Amino acid sequence: MDNSSRLFSPLRLGKCQLRHRVAMSPLTRFRADDLSVQMPFAKEYYAQRASVPGTFLVSEATSISRESVGFSNVPGIWNAEQVRAWKEIADDVHCKGSFLFLQLWATGRSATPERLQSGDFDFASSSAVPMEPGGAVPRELTEEDIHDLIARFAEAARRAIDAGMDGIELHAANGYLIDQFTQASCNQRTDRWGGSIENRARFAIEVTRSVVAAVGADRVGVKLSPWGKIQGMGTMQDLVPQFQYLVSELRDMGLAYLRLSNSRWIDGVPQEEEDNSIYVHTWGASRPVLLEGGYDPISAQKEADIRFNGYDAVIAFGRFFISNPDLPFRIKAGVDLQKYNRDTFYTPISEKGYIDYPFSTAFLEEHSSKASLKL
């Protein structure tokens, strides 16, 4: 690839000085143990993908509390053992000269009801609306519940910083709890948390304010998926004005970045991508915007160099970062990308398809050469 591409120009993102604009997306992999603690081999997984110095990585979605764990084998950040495991991961990423934000989530009605019931926890959401017709009906969260959740996000953010993270990303996308408040397809409340564009956005805004107060705006990013049609989302009438309002409110908080995601697949079926440019323009050019959604090296370069040339665009990769731990190097050097194996994306507590994708020969040769020069 042309070395003059903006993909390989430095960028300040919050407190992080990135050397390039090829980022790793948050990727749920189900490799944590049954107590939501990262397995020891997760250190190698993240360190591998941090091997190109100056890379920006965001962790898999991480539960803010025991009550918010919607699935088995996803990591958490509510106790000392989890913090300790994450700190070892963050330290290894920093040793590679790269940066790591922890993505925080609560699942709401997207959780597996049986998983919550096994811990005697509520299956709850913004409203008593099932994710699909005939599905489990969640309990509507009370005012007290909502304030408790806002506080728990802030507590989780503080623990993430204690774990050595460079910042946190709020998962406000893909039909999970924050998104369940933002979109009218789920949120049918008539109190201050629903019934209008401003009220539906209130939960996302208040959660963001709480984590900003806890750790600082330059340590906070937010992920949105305005066009996402998974888990019952993307069908509301005022979708564009809803997300334009939310983006404008987030913009005024001075956050480290905004992430905009497109859903490339729904139930194994490829989807046509909607245009996120309206939200990029609303966000503006003063702070970074991360874009993700099935990019390859060619389309990533076009986004950075042509379509969003006037913006601090960072292109985030998911699947290709799974199968190419040296992805930024491969893209810059024009090295072919390895194919990924979908069958091992979500294999619980398994090293297969997790830490066994090889580095390119070219990367290993350059790395070996630089190591020799230091001796």
UniProtKB/Swiss-Prot annotation:
Kindly list the cysteine pairs connected by disulfide bridges. Answer: none
Residues that, per the record, bind FMN? A61, Q103, H171, K223, G294, R319
Species annotation: Cladobotryum sp
Descriptive protein name: Aldehyde reductase FrzD
Q: Which GO terms describe its molecular function?
A: FMN binding; NADPH dehydrogenase activity
Q: Which gene underlies this protein?
A: FrzD
Function, in words: Aldehyde reductase; part of the gene cluster that mediates the biosynthesis of the alkaloid (-)-FR901483, a potent immunosuppressant that shows efficacy in animal models and a probable inhibitor of purine nucleotide biosynthesis by targeting phosphoribosylpyrophosphate amidotransferase (PPAT). Within the pathway, FrzD reduces the dienone portion of the pathway intermediates to cyclohexanone. The biosynthesis of (-)-FR901483 starts with the condensation of two L-tyrosines to yield (S,S)-dityrosyl-piperazine.
Q: Show the active-site residues.
A: Y176
- Identify the EC number(s): 1.3.1.-
This protein's record includes keyword Flavoprotein: yes
SUPFAM superfamilies, per database record: FMN-linked oxidoreductases
Q: Which Gene3D superfamilies match?
A: Aldolase class I
